[in-house]
UniProtKB/Swiss-Prot annotation:
Signal peptide: none annotated. GO terms for biological process: NAD biosynthetic process. Belongs to the NadD family. InterPro entries: Cyt_trans-like, NadD/NMNAT, Rossmann-like_a/b/a_fold. It comes from the Bacteria. Its EC number is 2.7.7.18. The gene is nadD. Keywords: ATP-binding, NAD, Nucleotide-binding, Nucleotidyltransferase, Pyridine nucleotide biosynthesis, Transferase. One of its GO terms (molecular function) is ATP binding. Catalyzes the reversible adenylation of nicotinate mononucleotide (NaMN) to nicotinic acid adenine dinucleotide (NaAD). This is Probable nicotinate-nucleotide adenylyltransferase. It catalyses: nicotinate beta-D-ribonucleotide + ATP + H(+) = deamido-NAD(+) + diphosphate. Pathway: Cofactor biosynthesis; NAD(+) biosynthesis; deamido-NAD(+) from nicotinate D-ribonucleotide: step 1/1.
Length: 199
């Protein structure tokens, strides 16, 4: 895991990043700015249990590309999940919390992930581990309201104007952050296009 100091506010931004692109970098930049992050851990996962491995580029390649895309020095590109041997986000976050009890973590996800978030293993446990910042993505601005996560944890929503103090909230707590959006999509890039209305 990247090094962090006691009291730091650290964003956790996980994904396959297959490939990483400027849309991911934009989400990271918005999160750093709006959440007042000291660091953002760009967590490149060895694999995604919900996605096919057939088109998954080698981890080393995705790490190198992520380093190229993530220019901000506060972004720490890492693949520590491979070392931990964890495949599921809930297990990874539990390990992160246990190893860093004095760091304030926020889980960061694109709004397009909310529609399937309830299919993640122990998804409600994830929501109860760290506060969550959902960053707007093209095509997901309105659909996030109908997501199972938004309905289940509607009581825990924090106003976007208070995003900068989300780290002070006890989970479950989440906020939806609007901002500039990129139409870039890893799926579209893999399929030979650079834009997708769906992601």
């Amino acid at each position: 895991m990247p090094h962090s100091e006691r009291g730091m506010v650290v964003g956790l931004f996980g994904g396959s990043f297959n490939p990483p692109h400027q849309g991911h970098a934009l989400v990271a930049e918005i999160a750093i700015k709006r959440l007042r992050l000291d660091q953002l851990w760009w967590m490149v996962t060895p694999g995604n249990p919900l996605k096919s491995r057939n088109q998954l580029a080698p981890l080393a390649e995705r790490l190198a590309e992520s380093e190229r895309v993530a220019a901000d020095p506060r972004i720490k590109v890492t693949a520590f999940e491979q070392t931990l041997g964890t495949s599921y986000t809930a297990n990874t976050l539990a390990r992160v919390k246990a190893r860093n009890p004095h760091v304030h973590f926020i889980w960061i996800m694109g709004a397009d992930s909310l529609q399937t978030f309830h299919k993640w293993q122990k998804w409600q446990e994830i929501a109860r581990t760290f506060p969550i910042a959902v960053i707007d993505r093209p095509g997901a601005t309105l659909s996030f309201l109908s997501s199972k996560m938004a309905r289940t944890f509607g009581f825990a929503r924090v106003d976007e104007d208070d995003a900068r103090v989300l780290w002070k909230k006890r989970a479950p707590a989440w906020t939806f952050i609007h901002g500039p959006r990129s139409g870039l999509s890893s799926t579209a890039i893999r399929n030979g296009s650079s834009h997708s209305d769906a992601e």
